[in-house]
Amino acid sequence: MELNVKTLEGKDAGKVSLSDAIFGLEPREDIIARVIRWQLAKKRQGTHKAQGRAEVSRTGAKMYKQKGTGRARHHSARAPQFRGGGKAHGPVVRSHEHDLPKKVRALGLRLALSAKLKAEDVIILDNLVAADAKTKALAGAFETLGLTNALFIGGAELDSNFKLAAANIPNIDVLPVQGINVYDILRRGKLVLSKAAVEALEERFK
């Protein structure tokens, strides 16, 4: 499969061949969903915490005598049914991470790339290089290309001017090829790959 290559100025810069093993798969929502759940679970801090009845600062003495009052039997005011009592089965500090086989993660990435290409949301640029770290100039180039919501994937080393200039543009993300992931691909409208990124992906999955 061949796609046209463009420059940041919108000019043609030849063609590039894309591997069907990476960009030509039939998308599977179940695999993609599993990978995204795995990614988001890893990102969770897990620092949520509620005090249980053993942890609240309150006397543990019996509230009133057992018999003779006509009221319900109670012991400590730390019990969860009372205002200020401990939370029953509340959240505790923990890790939300879970395992996902490496082969499934790799397949999920190829499926996400294939889904973007099938939706005609993949653009190939010859390189991601900016002459100056000027946001205004780069934003104008993106507007010319019709890129208002996009993920840019460069080579192993990003051009510092391009990265700095793109940092202040809303809805634009820039990552090196080793940072490419399913969640970021799907959360942005367009996927913009440099020729170096395409070569690195094909080397990674061959």
Swiss-Prot record:
Annotated region (Disordered), positions in chain: 63-97
> Would you say which domain of life the source belongs to?
Bacteria
Q: What does this protein do?
A: One of the primary rRNA binding proteins, this protein initially binds near the 5'-end of the 23S rRNA. It is important during the early stages of 50S assembly. It makes multiple contacts with different domains of the 23S rRNA in the assembled 50S subunit and ribosome. Forms part of the polypeptide exit tunnel.
Give the encoding gene's name.
rplD
Compositional bias per record (Basic residues), positions renumbered to this chain = 64-77
The UniProt entry's sequence similarity note says: Belongs to the universal ribosomal protein uL4 family.
Descriptive protein name: Large ribosomal subunit protein uL4
Q: Which HAMAP family match?
A: Ribosomal_uL4_B (MF_01328_B)
Give GO terms: molecular function aspect only. Answer: rRNA binding; structural constituent of ribosome
Is-annotated flag, keyword Flavoprotein?
A: no
- GO biological processes: translation
